[in-house]
Amino acid sequence: ARALCRPAVCRPRPLPPLPPTAMEEEVAALVIDNGSGMCKAGFAGDDAPRAVFPSIVGRPRHQGVMVGMGQKDSYVGDEAQSKRGILTLKYPIEHGIVTNWDDMEKIWHHTFYNELRVAPEEHPVLLTEAPLNPKANREKMTQIMFETFNIPSNYVAPVDSIQAEEWYFGKIGRKDAERQLLSPGNARGAFLVRESETTKGAYSLSIRDWDEARGDHVKHYKIRKLDTGGYYITTRAQFNSVQELVQHYVEVNDGLCHLLTAACTTMKPQTMGLAKDAWEISRSSITLQRRLGTGCFGDVWLGMWNGSTKVAVKTLKPGTMSPKASLEEAQIMKLLRHDKLVQLYAVVPEEPIYIVTEFMCHGSLLEFLKDQEGQDLTLPQLVDMAAQVAEGMAYMERMDYIHRDLRAANILVGERLVCKIADFGLARLIEDNEYNPRQGAKFPIKWTAPEAALFGRFTIKSDVWSFGILLTELISKGRVPYPGMNNREVLEQVEHGYHMPCPPGCPASLYEAMEQTWRLDPEERPTFEYLQSFLEDYFNGPQQN
């Protein structure tokens, strides 16, 4: 279990407010694909829908049949499907065209508040529509979005928009594309299309390939846009749309490394956080199922939210954190939304306080490294996991936010070796006087930069120091840092410039990067942006030798 702690001396300065531009950049547009059978919804730029459910509305056939079951006037989506024997089901969309606006409004309400759990007035919305949708329907959709849900802006796109294609992964980077395509469940010829990182309005096609020399790997092709509106990879084969281009290469490789065989599989996405007015939830909405671990300030449980969403729940012991502080932290953490940060969903602010987050199936990186699966990890896999942590920290660096307790125990591992940073920001709110850099075993001295341990000067550069220690945990597969030394010895030695020796099996160039993070002058340490780039490109250049 991961300890939630804070230093009790030299309290760090309060978190500065986020700049307006940074906050504005994080307001993602919502995409809702209103299909005849299924509704798909999510955030623009995500690699998969956040919610997929049947486009149905059900009502009780007979009054009184559902007494004691929390009877409602109507049920939507999966809940309606599960009660189909005692409900009358209706489909408000036929052939992509809305035929029942009252029921359609219920589906959109369910999409915003139950599936995506967002405040619609905070997000622009992109709705897809059938090609033959009448103009009156388009106007009605827009009217409901503005008048009922108060959305700030609305755009209706044809249902054949690239956004609706299962192979379109939106705004993901080259490295993430490789991660996804090389994960289990994909074979040679698996592919995805993503936004170009370098050319606005263009796309990239990423394909999984294999050869004897390189084994499994990914090749990338730029999809260029013609001035006339068409698309091409090579000028001899031009197409009116990206969909037509993809279909062509499904039928013939025509110069590509392989035929396009299947869209890249995606992990089932975790639902993003709750609406701004729903961070405070009722304890009765959470069911604790299994204790995952115990720490000095409480337990971590596998739980269910509203009986349908798998979550991780931190139960804090009374006196650990004030209810007011827990809600303040929830509001701050809502602004920090990134694929490599564990998403906070909600809090139960009455003691014992519950902190509800997304669930990561493999638990902490530290425990995972000690298991057999972790012991079998290769150097490229370990470096990729480090790159993911650096990516999350580079985002926090851009947002002027500090972690304060970065170590393998506070990194969580999910499916396909996805790593996410947990417990960011919680350390500074814990009300416990024993968590002291000069005394008490709870303080993680071995991970803490000397200026933070001795004087409480926590900055993003002290996080960089901690990241260097985390790298040794990764390479050594869970070994405690500074083996054979106690906290006092570590502090004394580090203050005089001592560095841990190179871990067994660690390339010299990677150890060099570790040593850069341990420079005594914080300003001489590298940025997380640099560390992310270094680690992502580690096996593309000569530095690994």
From Swiss-Prot:
Domain SH2, residue spans: 167-264
Keyword field: ATP-binding, Kinase, Nucleotide-binding, Oncogene, Phosphoprotein, SH2 domain, Transferase, Tyrosine-protein kinase
Matches recorded under InterPro entries: Actin, Actin/actin-like_CS, Actin_CS, ATPase_NBD, Fgr_SH2, Kinase-like_dom_sf, Non-receptor_tyrosine_kinases, Prot_kinase_dom
Catalyzed reaction equations: L-tyrosyl-[protein] + ATP = O-phospho-L-tyrosyl-[protein] + ADP + H(+)
Keyword set includes RNA-binding: no
Disulfide pairings: none
GO MF terms held by the record: ATP binding; non-membrane spanning protein tyrosine kinase activity
Enzyme class: transferase
Domain Protein kinase: residue ranges: 286-539
Record PTM Phosphotyrosine, positions in chain: 435
SUPFAM superfamilies (UniProt xref): Actin-like ATPase domain, Protein kinase-like (PK-like), SH2 domain
EC numbers on record: 2.7.10.2
Catalytic residues in the record: 405 (proton acceptor)
Sequence positions that bind ATP: 292-300, 314
Chain intervals for the UniProt region annotation (Actin): 23-157
UniProt KW Protein biosynthesis keyword: no
Other noteworthy facts: This protein is synthesized as a Gag-Fgr polyprotein.
Record-stated family: Belongs to the protein kinase superfamily. Tyr protein kinase family. SRC subfamily.
Protein name according to UniProt: Tyrosine-protein kinase transforming protein Fgr
